[in-house]
Amino acid sequence: MRIMKMKWLFFLLAVLYGHLPFAHALEPYSGSRIFWDTASRRTVFSSVGYARIIELQDGRLMAVCESGGIKIAFSQDKGSTWGSATKIVSNPAGIRECVPDLIQLSDGTIIVAYNPRPTSPYSEERKFGIRCKRSTDGGRTWSDEIFVNDALHTFADGCWEPSMLELPSGELQLYFADEGPYTSNNDQQISLCRSMDGGQTWSQAQKICYRQGSRDGMPVPVLLKDESQIVVIIEDNGWGYGDFFPTTVRTSLQNNWHNNYWVNATDPNREKTLNFNFCPTATGCRALAHADHVQERGSSARDARRIQPDH
């Protein structure tokens, strides 16, 4: 009798499985892929967070991270070996310097931008902000700290995650997630500050995208290869999936976010980036995407990018 019950159980499971959407064969993905050589892994920094890397004009690699301030390191051999880390920004009392970004301008100037984050208990003189430092000698020496933007002094009304882009005109742009304008709710926009003198002085922040009731965040800008458009990839939790979704917002280089233009919720220049045709819902794609984001948030907490929910 027990054997018969087991046979019926396997039969029912087989029938059920055969009717599930994910049981059907999917056409193999034929697009491009990237394979990483895990044997090439090298340690650049130890016990740090939010590392970024670029190739400099002289062929060196330069990395930056947060670790009790902001640290940098260089490689002379395309990343096979790395020099000792150098701290270029120290944490002031009651403030953590976080989430650095770096860029080398066409004239060779290197700029590192970062995000001062006050620790609790909060006080009005310690604000969440964006700052930067410049080097005109290949990273050997660095300028004094340069002011870019301030939000408020509380975690709920801060600013976050700077990312930079240089335009062909020489204009330097710094994008960041910005809660400062929304003190009465939990909304967040992407803001932009501009520099016309290589990062020495900066304009006031302007809005470039915002979805009411949602939290546009984590901007990374690029100029398309044909130099026709500025595209900024963000995370957007307003698509109705119950979590953040990779999204692009864009403008033409000619417009360049001028004439009070910004991308709202219904603007055709706001686009989702994932194509579920390659990973149908039935295969668990959305669940996996959600899980990956949750895992990223856990990693963020572990590496001290932020000890509170993602922005």
Feature-to-residue mapping (PLM):
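N-terminal secretory signal peptides that target proteins for export/translocation
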Residues: 1-6
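Extracytoplasmic beta-rich repeat domains
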Residues: 98-99, 157-165, 217-218, 281
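C-terminal segment of classical bacterial N-terminal signal peptides
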Residues: 16-23
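Sec-dependent N-terminal signal peptides
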Residues: 8-16
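Beta-rich carbohydrate-recognition and catalytic domains
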Residues: 26-95, 104-155, 166-213, 223-278, ...
